[in-house]
Amino acid sequence: MGRFLLVTLSLLVMAFFLNGANSCCCPQDWLPRNGFCYKVFNDLKTWDDAEMYCRKFKPGCHLASLHSNADAVEFSEYITDYLTGQGHVWIGLRDTKKKYIWEWTDRSRTDFLPWRKDQPDHFNNEEFCVEIVNFTGYLQWNDDSCTALRPFLCQCKY
């Protein structure tokens, strides 16, 4: 019995420290993931204003970049839980050259692009910023006018 209690207690302590290692430095209400902290903001902003808002937290903060299906699923659940409205959500991807060359604001690799069907399309030659689409369960992306007002997802390295 004593050995079982010791093993159980050791496992609980280890789980506590492992969980703390991932979330110890994120501000309250931010989601810890992959060494970054993420937060969805319900304020409606243009893509540029959203990026500037994210940058105000500290150097290295940007609109979020997503790099895997696991990221997409995690953020889908997080956005669904914390977004008070039902709008699409800005992320940190855009086509600054307007030639279907998509780049993240944090300069990370563009290695995951779960576009909605028939997207991106640069509709009317006006859509160069990327949003996560609400009616896909926040799992697929669309290009939209950078001046549209949207909630947004920030990421910061803490």
Swiss-Prot record:
GO terms for cellular component: extracellular region. Keywords: Calcium, Disulfide bond, Glycoprotein, Hemagglutinin, Lectin, Metal-binding, Secreted, Signal. Residues 33-155 form the C-type lectin domain. Glycans are attached at N134. InterPro entries: C-type_lectin-like, C-type_lectin-like/link_sf, C-type_lectin/snaclec_domain, C-type_lectin_CS, CTDL_fold. SUPFAM superfamilies: C-type lectin-like. It is found in: Secreted. Expressed by the venom gland. GO terms for molecular function: carbohydrate binding; metal ion binding. The keyword Calcium applies. Ca(2+) binds at Q119, D121, E127, N142, D143. Residues 1-23 form the signal peptide. Disulfide bonds join C26-C37, C54-C154, C129-C146. PROSITE patterns: C_TYPE_LECTIN_1, C_TYPE_LECTIN_2. It comes from the Eukaryota. CDD domains: CLECT_REG-1_like (cd03594). Pfam families: Lectin_C. A motif (Galactose-binding) lies at residues 119-121. SMART domains: CLECT. Belongs to the true venom lectin family. Galactose-binding lectin that binds to and agglutinates erythrocytes in a calcium-dependent manner. Dimer. Probably disulfide-linked homodimer. This is C-type lectin galactose-binding isoform. It comes from Pseudechis australis. The lineage of its organism: Eukaryota, Metazoa, Chordata, Craniata, Vertebrata.
